[in-house]
Amino acid sequence: ACGIIGLDLGATHITAVLTDLRGRVIASAYSEWPVRSDPDGARARAIELIDSCLARRPSASTRLLGIGVAVPSPVDPRHPERLSTLVLPAWGGRSGFELLRTRFGVPVFIDNDANLGALAEQWWGAGRGVSDFAYIKVATGVGSGHVIEGRVRRGATGVAGEIGHVAIDPRGALCSCGNRGCLVTFVGACALVERARALRPEYPDSSLDPATLTIEAIEAAAIADDPLAVQVVADAAGYLGIAIAGLLNLVNPGAVIIGGGLTRVGDRLLGPLREVVLRRTFVSAVAASEIKHSELGPLGVAVGAATLVLEAALADPALFPTIGAR
């Protein structure tokens, strides 16, 4: 039997999964980590998480086919080892994950996290049977992956899907990319925390403490129907809906799948989001495009990273001359 490792490097966490060849998770491991600012530590921690997953293989004879890595950066398909110095300046423009090939003796494949979220949904989740859809990940950052005519489309240099840097308000807040009013400045985790802190005086009955506000606290409070948290989520849904309406008018996907941590709040996000999209799309067939949650939960992107290896093996078995013994 063979297994595949998938790694999801978020801005503030690392997740590893060991899957079988049907995308089923055999083992998983998770660690909070300052990925953006500590590349050496992130790589070392990733190896520890991989070792943890491999230690829980169902059989010593389960061989490792390859390792897929999802990164929070555009990835040029022609140069997958390169990372954006704008998004991850501390990484110096390179992932450094060649060390995984050396350490584990198997091929390593790297792609953008939203692309791999889309790939996972296409193979195993809410995108099965849908030839054209968009996957949007809402977390610390905001990104999208696009399946068009049955394939993930990355663009000429790998930057397709950077929906987080679509300007919603050109007079808005300054974004880390240097532009103003990018979508991420309205719906990214930091933006939601700041929004909740700013609105707190208007909601004296809210359970949220401005001194200890986190995105996780906002999500939990929204689930509990805290009025401040519900308002923050509704505001985010409004801005996200503006971007999605533009996406629907432009490329007309059959579905939009929302992933990332904010999906934990359920219809408190999707309800107002759908309303905004309906108001802002001018063709009924476009407005009817299904907007739904990811079916794969918090492990979805890591499963997508593993699926990247499986896709490569099916497309070109010659890339896998040997199967690692580990």
Regions of interest found by a model, annotated:
Residues 1-63, 102-104, 124, 130, ...:
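ATP-binding/phosphotransfer module of carbohydrate and carboxylate kinases, centering on a glycine-rich
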